Amino acid sequence: MKDINNNFINTKNKPNQADYLEISQTLANFHATCFTNSKNRYSKKSMLFFLENPFYHIFYNQISLAIIQVTSEEAELITLAVESKQRKKGIGCNLLKSIILHLESIDIKNLFLEVAVTNKIALKLYDKVGFITCGLRKGYYGQGTNKKADAIIMTYAIVTGITKTLKSDKKKLQNLYPSG
């Protein structure tokens, strides 16, 4: 299997077809360990879909994972996961900065995401990076026992100049998530 640690997997740097099943299992296992108390985990089948679809860009190393869906001028953060023992160390923040720089390099203008109103840690992270609230989806997330949590919709405007401050961290970020 191709070593997928410390890698950005995209259409230019995707593993060969023979490795997809093994890599999708690795990604699904990692995601499940990060979301142990949630039904919001992605299966091997879902990860395989993300790997095979050129509209999805996957950032992965041994301690973090992010999947984004990219369209003509927008992107959506599908999931962001950091290993529980590695949280509150700036890893999620650095991962988001890497994603934003990548999106700027391919002329994406906005990054959107949905986050549960109950996920205070993630909300703090997104606020720190510079996301702003732009909407609310009522009852978006299932919470088990038929409870539903609302989702806050957030956006980050990727405009040359706004992301300029991130570029000072570019070398450090590229070491974490090389773009191949």
Predicted features along the sequence, with ranges:
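Acetyl-CoA-dependent GNAT
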Residues: I9-K14, L21-R87, C93-S98, H102, ...
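Helix-adjacent hinge/juxtasegments
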Residues: K89-G90, E114
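Conserved GNAT acetyl-CoA-binding A-motif
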Residues: L103-E114
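Short amphipathic helical patch at the helix-1/turn junction of helix-turn-helix
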Residues: V82, A116-V117
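Short glycine/proline-centered loop/turn elements that form peptide/ligand docking sites
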Residues: G92, L96, N119-A122, G139-T145
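Conserved catalytic-core motifs of GNAT/GCN5-like acyltransferases
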Residues: E114, D127, I132-A149
